[in-house]
Amino acid sequence: MERGERVSVPVSGYSRGEGVTVANELKKVDAVVVGFGWAGAIMAKELTEAGLNVVALERGPHRDTYPDGAYPQSIDELTYNIRKKLFQDLSKSTVTIRHDASQTAVPYRQLAAFLPGTGTGGAGLHWSGVHFRVDPVELNLRSHYEARYGKNFIPEGMTIQDFGVSYNELEPFFDQAEKVFGTSGSAWTIKGKMIGKEKGGNFYAPDRSSDFPLPAQKRTYSAQLFAQAAESVGYHPYDMPSANTSGPYTNTYGAQMGPCNFCGYCSGYACYMYSKASPNVNILPALRQEPKFELRNNAYVLRVNLTGDKKRATGVTYLDGQGREVVQPADLVILSAFQFHNVHLMLLSGIGQPYNPITNEGVVGRNFAYQNISTLKALFDKNTTTNPFIGAGGAGVAVDDFNADNFDHGPYGFVGGSPFWVNQAGTKPVSGLPTPKGTPNWGSQWKAAVADTYNHHISMDAHGAHQSYRANYLDLDPNYKNVYGQPLLRMTFDWQDNDIRMAQFMVGKMRKITEAMNPKMIIGGAKGPGTHFDTTVYQTTHMSGGAIMGEDPKTSAVNRYLQSWDVPNVFVPGASAFPQGLGYNPTGMVAALTYWSAKAIREQYLKNPGPLVQA
């Protein structure tokens, strides 16, 4: 039987009909990769380099810079940001959401609070480009807090834990990812040598083995004002690391990138300049040259197929573009979809014990976390012009004085930190028009307010690390199903007291920067006591947890190499592995962890298939 040839076999499990369905079984491959975003593309490249035959299954359509990023259609705000062209189709599958276990969850039917991607490149095609590493403290968060503040400092019901891997172990993979992405930035120290003082480096950054591939992007006027104000109140501003190129670049795989022109259309759009790193631009061109690699679009994976004892995966079952069930046998299964899709597939497939919040037992679905973000906007008079239509998704200036544990949390009684930044990514004419509080939503007064504020404002964020709690988790919904007849994933989530107290503290500190700019008005603020998670307002798409990594199979779904404790030929890279949220954006950490996992597969697992860590 040749590659791609089909035979009909009976397959049990969820289906669109009742009972047993008939599926087409393809020839076995060495590895099947589920989801082709950053994690999937990295894994596919690494495993293909190792000599494996790799098939990547992407549920969405084929996407690329052309035609999806072709100018001028690619800067159509109505199509992309308002009508959400590149995002997940919620009419086929979504999640249900409730604030606590006493409520009945209802489906998330309109894209708003978070925006999962679909299609080639996943969210990596239309992300902003903010490309951080991680603060080392956040990798051993529980043990660090217990050592510095005592075990009783961590609130009851907070389930934070250590990642099980250190910054020094991951540093080569952060470096590798930056060279693939073409990241622009300013280093602080390289191999212990100071190079970034008064040159845009981050005073709080951990040591690096080499410099950024490209210098930091130029600072917008907003970023300059923020940096001056931050310095004036004693903080340490630095250039944000950006996967938007500051100059021409050829990456590790031979992919060529052009310099960013600050067009302001990054988040929600495909970059027409080949300036923003994406799986489509930075990895796929090299994979296309590999005869051992195949990407199949419109391939919706229904489940991972397991042996009768559920100790080994035999491949996956998916629906192709014609709606036919297809079985793709494989020796190795990589779940590299979006965070909650990884968790959903594990629950549907019976990989790992589902989390039970009542007993606090089980692992799949536990420690779901988000991003605790707060925003302030400074409005100036007409003598200060900020040109907010200019922008690059990852460019900006940040301060880390209150990130991670860079300050003494003891007097304040909350866990977690937050960077502050001005990240001018391009304020759009439909969705990005700030007006003072009390302005009507339409009419002559609204028009006058827009004219008065649009070109004279700055927006800044406190990008708070969100902690994990026993009360916030993922499981299968008992009431709602997707179009394929499978239970939807249920998200039980709400802000906790720690989140609100942290947000209020951070906004107070960030407000000092804002006031130092001498604006005529400041709008925005922190969550107040009793604030509930609002699904109707965009916050971030930085979801994490649910299939977390760790050193104990009783409290983690995957080991330190992202290998399933229960099914050792299944690996699950992605933000689903984070035991709690980070202060920084997750993409850099996802990329480094995926390279780390891929190396373990190549150098250890393929030589001796089986558990890489003994339970």
From Swiss-Prot:
Keyword Disulfide bond: no
Active site: 542
Localisation: Cell membrane
Xref: SUPFAM superfamilies: FAD-linked reductases, C-terminal domain, FAD/NAD(P)-binding domain
Protein's organism: Pantoea cypripedii
The protein's required cofactors: FAD
Cited InterPro entries: FAD/NAD-bd_sf, GMC_OxRdtase_N, GMC_OxRtase_C
pH-related activity note: Optimum pH is 5.0.
Subunit-level organization: Heterotrimer.
Presence of the UniProt keyword Membrane in the record: yes
Catalytic activity, as annotated: D-gluconate + A = 2-dehydro-D-gluconate + AH2
Keywords linked to the UniProt accession: Cell membrane, FAD, Flavoprotein, Membrane, Oxidoreductase, Signal
GO cellular component: plasma membrane
Protein name as it appears in the record: Gluconate 2-dehydrogenase flavoprotein
